[in-house]
Swiss-Prot record:
Role, per record: The recombinant protein causes paralysis to polychaete worms (Nereis virens), the natural prey of terebrid snails.
Top-rank taxon: Eukaryota
Localization terms from the record: Secreted
GO molecular function ontology, one term from the record: toxin activity
Tissue expression per record: Expressed by the venom duct.
PTM statement from Swiss-Prot or TrEMBL: Contains 3 disulfide bonds.
Name used for this protein in its record: Teretoxin Tgu6.1
Propeptide: 17-52
Origin species: Terebra guttata (White spotted auger snail)
Keywords: Disulfide bond, Neurotoxin, Secreted, Signal, Toxin
Signal sequence interval, chain numbering: 1-16
Domain-level remarks: The cysteine framework is VI/VII (C-C-CC-C-C).
GO CC, alphabetical: extracellular region
Length: 96
């Protein structure tokens, strides 16, 4: 039981420090916040779990950029637009 508690404590501290480095930009969209997180994921091996949880907490917005770890909202597809992977609707891809 004690090793499990130590593990939970380490994971909690590691997640806390990974979010502490992120600036709090109140006016930014969810997309830019998740893009900032994507740059820092190499430092934290638990990042995909943490990033997905944060994205789910911010359910009011939809990411603009996507990757193998950042998913688009329902009804949007991840497409290469001008060399960047973006979440787009079918209508916007057709120019409507």
């Amino acid at each position: 039981m004690r090793p499990f508690l130590v593990f939970v404590l380490i994971v909690s501290v590691s997640l806390a420090f990974s979010f502490e480095d992120m600036p709090n930009k109140g006016g930014d969209s969810v997309a830019s916040i998740t893009a900032d997180q994507a740059r820092g994921h190499k430092r934290n091996p638990l990042f995909p779990f943490a990033q997905r949880s944060l994205t789910e907490l911010k359910a009011g917005g939809c990411p603009l950029y996507c990757s193998s770890q950042i998913f688009c909202c329902h009804g949007r597809k991840c497409r290469n637009v001008d060399g960047r992977l973006k979440c787009v609707t079918e209508a916007s891809m057709l120019g409507k």
